[in-house]
Design a protein with these regions (language model features):
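Non-catalytic regulatory/linker segments of enzymes
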Residues: 1-146
Length: 146
């Protein structure tokens, strides 16, 4: 059994995960090499792709989200609204040429990758996941009303 087979064997949609990796490799060959060297992150990316075609597409379109996820995926606490507002401000600075509604959508999707992964890996309770989604919505709403 090769590495890919062992990583996808317990996923709900092995075919979707495999197709995701093929598409990611075609579009981002150099990033794929880096991803292949980090088995934990590769496993997380395949897991997200297997559970959600939306997240698979998000990662393919925004491969840098993986490296952000690598830094954030070990956090075990709920991020509060103020932390998310700060993170949104940093995201907005690095994406200053994007229309606000697109910026908010991209930020939300990036954060949902992290939150959804915590849920899939059972690193948080349903109450914590719900709280984080609520905090994320509050942060985006507050920022948009400024």
């Amino acid at each position: 059994m090769n590495k890919l087979d062992s990583l996808v064997k317990d996923l709900p949609d092995k075919e979707l995960a495999t197709r995701f990796l093929k598409q990611f490799t075609e579009r981002h060959p150099s990033k794929t090499e880096k991803l292949q060297k980090n088995e934990g992150l590769l496993s997380d990316a395949l897991t997200l792709a297997s559970f959600s075609p939306l997240f698979a597409t998000t990662i393919i379109q925004n491969p840098d989200y993986l490296w952000w996820l690598e830094r954030k995926r070990t956090e075990s606490r709920v991020r509060n609204k103020d932390e998310l507002l700060e993170s949104l401000a940093r995201f907005a600075l690095t994406n200053s040429q994007i229309e606000p509604q697109i910026l908010f959508a991209r930020f939300r999707r990036r954060e949902l990758l992290r939150i959804f992964l915590r849920d899939i890996r059972r690193l948080a309770t349903i109450a914590e996941i719900t709280e984080e989604i609520s905090n994320l919505a509050d942060a985006i709403l507050e920022n948009s009303l400024r």
